[in-house]
Amino acid sequence: MSARAAAAKSTAMEETAIWEQHTVTLHRAPGFGFGIAISGGRDNPHFQSGETSIVISDVLKGGPAEGQLQENDRVAMVNGVSMDNVEHAFAVQQLRKSGKNAKITIRRKKKVQIPVSHPDPEPVSDNEDDSYDEEVHDPRAGRGALANRRSEKSWARDRSASRERSLSPRSDRRSVASSQPAKPTKVTLVKSRKNEEYGLRLASHIFVKEISQDSLAARDGNIQEGDVVLKINGTVTENMSLTDAKTLIERSKGKLKMVVQRDERATLLNVPDLSDSIHSANASERDDISEIQSLASDHSGRSHDRPPRRSQSRSPDQRSEPSDHSTQSPQQPSNGSLRSREEERMSKPGAISTPVKHVDDHPPKAVEEVTVEKNEKQTPTLPEPKPVYAQVGQPDVDLPVSPSDGALPNSAHEDGILRPSMKLVKFRKGDSVGLRLAGGNDVGIFVAGVLEDSPAAKEGLEEGDQILRVNNVDFTNIIREEAVLFLLDLPKGEEVTILAQKKKDVYRRIVESDVGDSFYIRTHFEYEKESPYGLSFNKGEVFRVVDTLYNGKLGSWLAIRIGKNHKEVERGIIPNKNRAEQLASVQYTLPKTAGGDRADFWRFRGLRSSKRNLRKSREDLSAQPVQTKFPAYERVVLREAGFLRPVTIFGPIADVAREKLAREEPDIYQIAKSEPRDAGTDHRSSGIIRLHTIKQIIDQDKHALLDVTPNAVDRLNYAQWYPIVVFLNPDSKQGVKTMRMRLCPESRKSARKLYERSHKLRKNNHHLFTTTINLNSMNDGWYGALKEAIQQQQNQLVWVSEGKADGATSDDLDLHDDRLSYLSAPGSEYSMYSTDSRHTSDYEDTDTEGGAYTDQELDETLNDEVGTPPESAITRSSEPVREDSSGMHHENQTYPPYSPQAQPQAIHRIDSPGLKPASQQKAEASSPVPYLSPETTPASSASAVNHNVSVTNVSLEEPAPAPPTSHASQPGCLGAPSAEAAHVVLRGEGPPLPPHADPAKVYRKEPYSEEMMRQNHILKQPALGHPGQRPDKEPNLAYEPQLPYIEKQASRDLEQPSYRYEVSSYTDQFSRNYDHRLRFEDRIPTYEDQWSYYDDKQPYQPRPFENQHPRDLDSRQHPEEASERGYFQRFEEPAPLSYDSRTRYEQLPRTSTLRHEEQPAPAYEVHNRYRPEAQPYSSTGPKSSEPKQYFDQYPRSYEQVPPPGFTSKTGHYEPLHGAAVVPPLIPSSQQKPEVLPSATKPQPPPPTLTEEEEDPAMKPQSVLTRVKMFENKRSASLENKKDVNDTASFKPPEVASKPPGASLAGPKPVPQSQFSEHDKTLYRLPEPQKPQVKPPEDIVRSNHYDPEEDEEYYRKQLSYFDRRSFESKPSAHLPAGHHSEPAKPVHSQSQPNFSSYSSKGKPETDAVDRSFSEKRYDPAQATPPPPPLPSQYSQPAPPLSSSSLHIHSKGAQGEGNSVSLDFQNSYMSKPDPPPSQSKPATFRPPTREDPPQTFYPQKSFPDKAPVNGAEQTQKTITPVYNRFTPKPYTSSARPFERKFESPKFNHNLLPSETVHKPELSSKTPTSPKTLMKAHSSTQPPEFDSGVETFSVHTDKPKYQMNNISTMPKAVPVSPSAVEEDEDEDGHTVVATARGIFNSNGGVLSSIETGVSIIIPQGAIPEGIEQEIYFKVCRDNSILPPLDKEKGETLLSPLVMCGPHGLKFLKPVELRLPHCDPKTWQNKCLPGDPNYLVGANCVSVLIDHF
């Protein structure tokens, strides 16, 4: 093209860039400020170029700067103050201090036309010319899409030089050329020896920053410092990141060819020398660098930018936030780069809209250039692919992008841009368009597959083509879901015109990097996850959506939660926009009528006489805040507030705070005066604050202090005023009284009212708070903290709507009569009208009625209206409260002290209501409030706490309220089970805490539980999502919180002996261990809510184990429900552990204790969990009698001790469990018979299959989704397991695990579980029964093996969802130590382990099954799945499902012995005691094995089947395998096997794997049921080996054999190796992943740790299925002390890969998360090609293990 271009440009002018300086005077305008946003600064250099200039990142339309300033202008001076090399905050302050007018001097890059002087250089290289042209037009052109988006305009990244860089390369060349078009100089450096360096250091512009003395470049003499590098080895450097350029140079293989442009004016050399040349850190942090589309740098960069950028986290958004507000919100994830690119596309001439436009922009360019430009445009999309975050705390689903990807992008970029092959395809749509799509708004929409013989295929569309336009609809910035829906909506027979461009390389990188969509949303409703991989959330949470077509299906989005400091915290599934709108609408309408009879009773009980109208009006008003104008998902971007944001203060002393600020800081704060709504109206009745009033105050450069309702705050946010909302969190009612007496003695406001209303406010509107300050009544330190918080919030970036508000908000803010809203109640601190006598009286008189909660009743309606009706409605101590746990937790983050307390309290509270008298409840409610307040508003603390509490102790209790969509059921739960509710509340209150437990401890525990719950919730969230099952699942979740406990169990157990019987101690330990997670508690509450929701029926479930026993049994709420749920929940809770193997492990013990206390509960729980049928049983009498049959011995034994242990936690009570377990174990054989009955139920397991089937659906998905699909499968399998576990399998396991026998049986049952999800469910049930059989011996044994396996598995499970697994792991180790404890501890551990194992097995089985056999038997499973759901064990099990051990709750409950895991397969017989004995060999401890053996054969066989599921067979091995198993979910080869058709993987992989995978699954526990059974039936010993996993050593070999059986040539994996690693000396295994791969390759990844191994196609010889695993370890002996509070982290984790001795035909890529400080920006160009450090990950190529 250079020749062509030269010809075309022979008479044309070359476009080059120069810098112009302009000085403008801006006048501050109300509502706009100066109308600009700035980014950059010394502390926030451009992520790519390192430029530290202050850059105009956004110019508001209609603002004062419009037409005067432009985006990407560099700010040179403000009011005469130089802005060179200053910090961002300094620049912002200068603008703020400038008053009404600001004189701003800017430097602007201007393109000028200069006679083209390329011809000479052009001959040098056509590419060269092209690249030059490209660069010339690139500024706006297609590559501009990249460049534009990413750096060219530096839209968001303007602040960085990277933009400049991208522009610079062209612009600099041009600038040089502008004066005199200098010819590009071609330089070729040839190394004389391999280790010789080129001696170049490239800066952000891709220009020569410096030349080393005596280097090749210096000796050559043709390169000078400041030369702009146009091409590297034929690849155009325009829009290329430094990382990509570095990669290109590293790949030069000793010969480096470069085309450079002499920069006579040394413009580039004068660019501020930041860390711009540090491609590694900067590249990662500066998206611009990744412009070239280096996925590695781009992804990492963005991810780093996003969270890490400055404390204000300005950087992530700053780049992108201002300009691509609306368009880039999706791209925002890419941080500025996406936005900048997108905006550039949009704002730049047709950058996004049409590649051709770019051509127009650069007329001089040749047509080919135009194509290139188009390519560039598309390419920009490519850079967008943000690989996964590999950050330590983020369990990202996305695969870490390998640094090497960067080079690919370059080539792709080069090819696409230089030789874009655009095609216009026209055809008529048939039944379908015949296309599968990959990509997304972040990278572009690509064709991932074309249906053979379809019109599209005939017209030449092929995989890897980027779709630029369809029927004149621009596809360059559209999310994948919208693209798919658009194509689906096209009428049949309509002509379809597609403009596409061939970009195979880019597509391949996208698929391999698993990138596509990327935009930010803020939620405006509450959601409880429906699957293990789901994410629960409250209102006001921010997510980055990375895949809008998760699993290749409509309905779910893959999103990453954005936590504190805008860091990405965890990823999972959320409903898509359409579903979210439906859920939100239901949530907003339900509250008004939600509650049912019971809720109505509570709501209206206190509405007597004069209060009725008042309360009704208040209810009406409270509905308003809920009726937000925001959509369910609001697209947001991070931006700076260009004005002084209004300040709203909530809390018991808000009135004092406002007056104090306005009085002492009149130059900064001014109270916005309210006006009567209408002239002549009683001012007190209602008033409004005019928006005009606020604007006037802002125009005076002051913060407007607003006394408004939460509804008004929501409207302010909608109007994009984004007030700073500070919540002053009271410490106690007495504290409020003390403070008000001190601060405003004349005030007549009721301290109690203020306190309660504060808690309600926090519970229902916590999402509105921008910061929370914990009040200490002993001092006035809150005032300084308040001022500091306001200043900090003002300086921070704000998540703002991408677009303008749909309609202008009303011109005023309703102050809302105090009566109308507790927030604005005149009597409350929130209302400016404190004179309303009615309110004052209301404050006073409610004391008598409902106690402290009468008010809450009033607020109930408010809450309901707000969208959390259950919570508010259930504020009474005696009535179940819905906890806005997540919300509260968010607040908890704000107030750490509270969150620990709050959660535990919630737990206590749940129990306490049922247990304590109303008065006591009230008192307790008050006392717990402080605890609650952290979690939730004190007023709603009962509910909120309940949720939290329910998580740890009775998380099930609150479940009902939690689910927003289950309001109807919730009310029933809440209302009908009043006893339950009461129990919940009681528990929430302090009293539920065991006498031994200390509240603090409990609280801590709780938070942790919640957190764990969240994780578990993710894992466990029922995949099925049936309402009925959901509650059961929820209970699982409730138990889940214990997962964390389990993880920490060892340590906890060690400490817990004293609290063994105290839940509080349990929580306390948790708290300590997991405090760091508290910040995630926001989410946890959500989980808790889910629990509540699930536990809807089980409010009594207050599982304050002992205390709750009676409550659980309380039939008054729902005798059946209560017992079922409560008990079931207990057991169910363990089920969730199955997902979080550790959690479950601990939880099981706890549940065991609890359950044992409530003997019926265990049996019931099993049933309930499995299905409604069970519930009837529970409700009947079996509740106590039937469950007892199975669990009675067990529970009774427990009951004696359990009450204490119960509260403490089952894990602690392992001894108790052990005792209980013994009896169940004995009946194991008997139980088997029961299993047979349940065997009929096995069908329920098929639902799991259904989910698995879904995985195949993923198959059609593009390669892009491969990783996602992999995750999906993993999550699906987890979900299925969860469903099975939660509803059936999981729950039964919990039951099993709970009973001591279960733990004993655990090993065997666990394998069974692993066999298949269906089987697992069955086995799970048997587990509980088993416990009956075996006495302490088994318990000890279980404990013995449990600790290792459990912790391993636990870690794995947890790791899936959360980094928390890391912390959990230590706990898990502790449990290992703990198991050495008396039989009790052992038992509890073993039991948990069992459940854990089961849970593990399930997840793993599912994971493996799904990953390996999912496809294989997915279809088979698909058919059976639906029916199985109804069965007790809703959890589907693969083949086993038919023979799966469905342990009927009845049977389990009624016939303690009868509970037998009966696999219809030979496994069924296996369960017989003799088999168990034979298994004893398999199991480490024969004793333990014996009772379990019965269960074990069944379970072990299934477990055995899946390689990853081996864990389920044996706890010990399980841990190791478990880790792998979870990884298989996360990392099994399945993604590729599945239905991925990415170029990277073989599409056929799935089918072949379908065939082999089942075997593998059997080998790996994938096809635990059928395959495993086939194997085990033929070779029971193998299953035994699987079970042997329990006995780490023996089992491992067998397991190994099992794996090997399917792949004779494959290198066997030594189970012992895997297992030992877990407890390796000096190493703590944080996570494991394992999977079976064939010649098609695949990706093995660990979501929680971000570690992944990418096996290319052909790396494994044909015909061999090789199991591969890796363990992510923490080397405690080597690690230096890290100060995590200061952000010190390991740059990369320690990873051990296996099996050792395995050699690959092609190198496999090991990607490790890499968190490199932004300050370490320098990277040496020369380096090992097999080792590449990216922004977020390190990529290592290895050819053998």
From Swiss-Prot:
Its cellular-component GO annotations read: adherens junction; apical junction complex; apical part of cell; apical plasma membrane; apicolateral plasma membrane; basolateral plasma membrane; bicellular tight junction; cell junction
SH3 domain: residues covered: 516-584
Q: Which GO terms describe its molecular function?
A: calmodulin binding; connexin binding; protein domain specific binding
Identify residues that carry Phosphoserine.
125, 175, 178-179, 212, 241, 275, 277, 280, 284, 290, 294, 297, 300, 323, 329, 334, 337, 353, 617, 622, 810, 821, 824, 828, 837, 912, 1071, 1138, 1365, 1411, 1542, 1614
Q: Enumerate the spans annotated as Guanylate kinase-like domain.
A: 610-791
Superkingdom, taxonomy of origin? Eukaryota
Keyword Isomerase assigned to the entry: answer is: no
Q: What post-translational changes are documented for it?
A: Phosphorylated at tyrosine redidues in response to epidermal growth factor (EGF). This response is dependent on an intact actin microfilament system. Dephosphorylated by PTPRJ.
- Ranges annotated as spanning the membrane: none
Ranges of biased composition (kind: Polar residues): 325-338, 1455-1468, 1510-1519, 1561-1580
Positions modified as Phosphothreonine?
185, 267, 354, 809, 846, 848, 854, 861, 868
Which segments carry the region annotation Occludin (OCLN)-binding region? 633-876
CDD domains, sorted: PDZ1_ZO1-like, PDZ2_ZO1-like_ds, PDZ3_ZO1-like_domain, SH3_ZO-1
Q: What is this protein called?
A: Tight junction protein 1
Q: What is the lineage of its organism?
A: Eukaryota, Metazoa, Chordata, Craniata, Vertebrata
